[in-house]
Amino acid sequence: MAGRELSHLQQLEAESIQIIREVAAEFDNPVMLYSIGKDSSVMLHLARKAFYPGKIPFPLLHVDTGWKFKEMIAFRDAQAKKFGFELLTHINPEGLAQGINPFDHGSAKHTDIMKTQGLKQALNQYGFDAAFGGARRDEEKSRAKERVYSFRDRHHRWDPKNQRPELWRTYNGAVNKGESIRVFPLSNWTELDIWQYIYQENIELVPLYFAAKRQVVERGGQLIMADDERMKLAEGEQIKEEVVRFRTLGCYPLTAAMHSEADSLEKIIEEMLLTRSSERQGRLIDSDQSASMEQKKRQGYF
């Protein structure tokens, strides 16, 4: 009798769990980067499955910037309490002292100091030799050519010309002292796969992903949510109420909402089947300049 064939989502799940287990067994001090978004929520769910009924054997790290949506931080803390995983948080103390923010210093400087440099500080502080990330190859062209095991030098820099072959799902995790690996268990997933898996597994998400009435400002053709009193308005701008949701999450001044009536997982999946635009069109940091994501990754970004 032939064995039961795995569904598409089951194959992706099995591949990701195998990667997570292999890293946990192979590296001395791994960590899972937790950005609180939908991909991080799926990756956390997979990690819990990988080691069930035991606890996740490595910590989760959130690199905060001080500008995340309030609902993201509340969700992060609630998830840590619910599932009992070890949660580490880090915010760049120098950037905090200088008052670095996306309004006064721009997206490029804010992202470099508060995210890239903040991440490198945390990785150095704890001595992590492998860091899981939730990036997928369908998101953006620089990520499309990145390996599952993404080698980083002692300065956490990525060189796209210095990558290792990954034939037949065989991964080379050998690193010298001070070097590290970024690991992407969701590399072969698509945005639609993520949403269908969330629906199948009933995974909790930040409410911002679902359409609701929210206070937004139209700026440069994008809808920016006024999440707190720090929101700075340009001359002529007005806050208005619109029914919107977010396809991707980050710092609220740098993350655009979209008009949508999708207030349930079923409606979001239906919307995904019809959309032809990139989910990262709402990430203002990606529009700094041509190939900006690859340049950020070369400097140590996620």
Swiss-Prot record:
The keyword Endoplasmic reticulum does not apply. GO terms for biological process: hydrogen sulfide biosynthetic process; sulfate assimilation. It catalyses: sulfate + ATP + H(+) = adenosine 5'-phosphosulfate + diphosphate. GO terms for molecular function: ATP binding; sulfate adenylyltransferase (ATP) activity. Keywords: ATP-binding, Nucleotide-binding, Nucleotidyltransferase, Transferase. Its EC number is 2.7.7.4. Residues 280-302 are annotated as: Disordered. It is an enzyme of class 2 (transferase). Pathway: Sulfur metabolism; hydrogen sulfide biosynthesis; sulfite from sulfate: step 1/3. InterPro entries: PAPS_reduct_dom, Rossmann-like_a/b/a_fold, SO4_adenylTrfase_ssu, Sulfate_adenylyltrnsfr_sub2. It comes from the Bacteria. NCBIfam families: CysD (TIGR02039), PRK05253.1 (NF003587), PRK12563.1 (NF009214). HAMAP family: Sulf_adenylyltr_sub2. Heterodimer composed of CysD, the smaller subunit, and CysN. With CysN forms the ATP sulfurylase (ATPS) that catalyzes the adenylation of sulfate producing adenosine 5'-phosphosulfate (APS) and diphosphate, the first enzymatic step in sulfur assimilation pathway. APS synthesis involves the formation of a high-energy phosphoric-sulfuric acid anhydride bond driven by GTP hydrolysis by CysN coupled to ATP hydrolysis by CysD. Belongs to the PAPS reductase family. CysD subfamily. PANTHER family: SULFATE ADENYLYLTRANSFERASE SUBUNIT 2. This is Sulfate adenylyltransferase subunit 2. It comes from Shewanella baltica (strain OS195). The gene is cysD.
